[in-house]
Amino acid sequence: MSRQINAVTPSSSSRRHRLSLSRRRINFTTSPEALPSSSSRSQPSSSSRSQPYSSSRSQPYSSSRRRRRQERSQEQRVSEDNVQIIGNANEPLTRTYHSQGVTYHVHGQVNISNDDPLLSQEDDTIESVDRASQQYQNSIASETAAQRALQRGLDLESQLMSEISPRSPAYSPPYPSNDVLSQSPDLFDSPQSPQQHELELEDEDEEEEEEEGEEVEVSCNICFTTLKDTKNVDSSFVTSIDCNHAVCFKCYVRIIMDNSTYKCFCSASSSDFRVYNKHGYVEFMPLTLIRNRDSIKQHWRELLENNTVNNRIIDLNDVERLERERSELRAKNSQVEHKMTMLNCDYAMLKHEHKITELKLKWANRDLEEFTKKTQELQSTVNDLQEQLRKQVAESQAKFSQFERRNSELVAELYTIEMSKP
């Protein structure tokens, strides 16, 4: 059995309540309208987009595109959470099962054995699941029909509103000869053609957003002014339809003002011009030429009032303040550099003094060791002399006592002799 499941399978306890094909084979053949396919699930999003499309001129295109993208991602997450695929998803759908709030799609010829835990119930359970799946398919079919009716009503309402609403004074119809969108017959095949066109534009915008634009420096062929444009996205140059020499807008206006007709440096004259961007190009031609030196002054006056914040006094004050701050920072930087130089000098001197002190300490330790040795030698000599002196004193005392005793004996003997004489 080869089976591929693209979602988290339920636990073993919930598998006991699923379909069983041990005694008979269940084959649900559902029509494409009743299947919970991506088209039926995307109906609410398309219906929700139909009304904003009728008023797309009053809302920014970026916000509606972001909302549609969020709805699409949310629907995709919900569909992926509730659908499991068995078999190869590239093969055609053969069977569909629904149990425990999860829809199982079987693609291709999948051999499912009778001992599969997905199919572990008796016939009565099969009949109940059969009825539940039939009710689910009926509810899906009714919901799909209601969504289609709602979508049809919204499309008719938007079509009526577009026909009834008056056009604005600034409305300019597209050129039927050059506009590719107006020539496409697909826009008039069904009431959902505006939504399809909008989805196509959205897909194109998403593809363009994924591609990172490369900024390229391009120079004008006349004034050689270098402009930076994004490759394959936008262009700041005007191109004649008779030659391929692109010029900037300033040179184009100057040539028109000088010659009344545009004549390129390659001697090619033309009255039609093109300006390109990522969506296509715009053809235009100069209609009216008015020579008035005050018009540029009025134009710049409006630019300074509406497009820029250009106050000469404020700019000068800012420049003076920045110059002052730069001077102060330079002075502080000089002081810091001077302090760093002094500190480096002090550090070098302290480093030398440290080395000298270490050398002196080494010498002092050596002298201390020598003095300690000499002191120990002298101490041993003093001890020897003291011992010798003690011995000499003891010998002297013994000798003196012996002399005294002998002297007393001799004196007594002499006295005895003198007394014995007649």
Curated annotation (Swiss-Prot):
Post-translational modifications: Auto-ubiquitinated.
Chain intervals with Low complexity compositional bias: 36-63
Enzyme class: transferase
Any one of the GO CC terms: host cell nucleus
SUPFAM superfamilies (alphabetical): RING/U-box (SSF57850)
Biological processes annotated in GO: symbiont-mediated perturbation of host ubiquitin-like protein modification
Zinc finger (RING-type) boundaries: 220-268
Acidic residues bias locations: 200-215
MF GO annotations: transferase activity; zinc ion binding
Bias kind Basic residues: ranges: 14-26
Coiled coil spans: 314-414
Function summary: RING-finger E3 ubiquitin ligase that plays an important regulatory role during the initial stages of infection. Migrates to specific nuclear foci early in infection supposely to prepare the sites for viral replication by targeting and ubiquitinating host proteins.
UniProt protein name: E3 ubiquitin-protein ligase IE2
Organismal lineage: Viruses, Viruses incertae sedis, Naldaviricetes, Lefavirales, Baculoviridae
